[in-house]
Each structure stands twice: as C-alpha cells, then as structure tokens.
Amino acid sequence: IVACLVGSEMCIRDSGISNAKDASALTALGLHALQHRGQEGCGIVSFDGEKYYSEKRFGLVGDNFNKEKVLNNLKGDYAIGHNRYSTTGNNTLRNIQPFFADTNAGGIGVAHNGNLTNSIYLRNKLVEDGAIFYTTSDTETIVQLIAKSKRSKTIDKVVDAIFQIQGGYALVMLTQTSLIGVRLSLIHI
C-alpha cells in the first residue's frame, strides 16, 4: 500500500516520508518499488480537491503507469495505490484495488493488504441487508461496512467498520479531507 499527500508536502510509503510534487506519479514510483509485493495488477486512486480519478490495470506498474499516463489520467495532490497479490477473490480487473465508493459522507478510496478472517460472515450479513457486491474481494466488505455505517463523519464510519472486521490487515484510505492509515485496529489520520 502506498499513499501520497502533497497538500502538506508529504509522501507516506509504508513507513517512509519524503517531499512530493505529484502525488500520482510518486505513488506509481512507490508501487514500482513495492512491485515484489504483488504482480497480478496495480491501481491508483487520486483526488484533486473536487473529483476522484481511478486507474487499474493487470500486470506490472512499469508497464502500466508511466509518467505521462499518470499525469494525464490521475489528477490531484492526493493519491493512494495498491499492487495486487490475491489471497481472496478471483483474478479479475474488478478485484484490483484501490476501491472507490461514494457515501453519504463523501467519497472514499480504500486499499487493503491482509486477510479478514470474518469476511464471509460479514459479506453474507451485508447481502442479507440488501448490499450489492461488485467484486469477490474481501476488501469490498470493508467498503460496504463504511458505506452502511449510520455515522455522519467519514472517520467515524471507518471506525465502525474497523471494529467489525477481524484478521491481520493494513489499510490506507483517501477521503476528501484526509489520508487514513489503519493497521490491525490502530487508526492514524
């Protein structure tokens, strides 16, 4: 998982921090450095202060996200990215992260590494309550839990979702106002 925040001149790549001028291009570079973590596909979600942009592709970062493509298609000073190595879900374009959703509190991009041990239970419960799933990835369960939360603020929706999931995981989320990082149940904004 790679996240870049240019609004405050920071780029977060797992535990590293550096200056950034183009969030999406720097995210692509970070994904390239982490290519060994997943080679099935890659994706980036960016935000320009008004609109979210998303690009997802099968294959390696260097084959899909050259600087020109990134700059043309992924505008904005905020970005998150993900290299896919599937542990759950089929190897389809739909399952490549980050995922993006509009909620009643605004848009959110979500990238996740790990395994949710209760994802089947949660997914079945969400479907019984009327949720429609687009992917076979357990990450979408997290997105659905965030969207379903009755809380009004995005961070509160995230907290609600985190308290429902079990397993080993790390998440990075991009909202209209912040980047949110979560490891197990520790939340960092």
Regions found by a protein language model. Give the residues of each.
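Single conserved hydrophobic/aromatic residue that forms the stacking wall/gate
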Residues: 1-9, 188
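Extreme N-terminus nucleophile/cap motif
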Residues: 8-59
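Short acidic-glycine loop/turn motifs at beta-strand connectors
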Residues: 19-21, 46-51, 103-104, 128, ...
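Short histidine
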Residues: 37, 117-175
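Structured interaction and signal-relay segments at domain junctions
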Residues: 50-77
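Acidic, glycine-enriched active-site microenvironments
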Residues: 58, 86, 125, 140-141, ...
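Glycine-rich oxoanion-binding loops at beta->alpha junctions
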Residues: 83-94
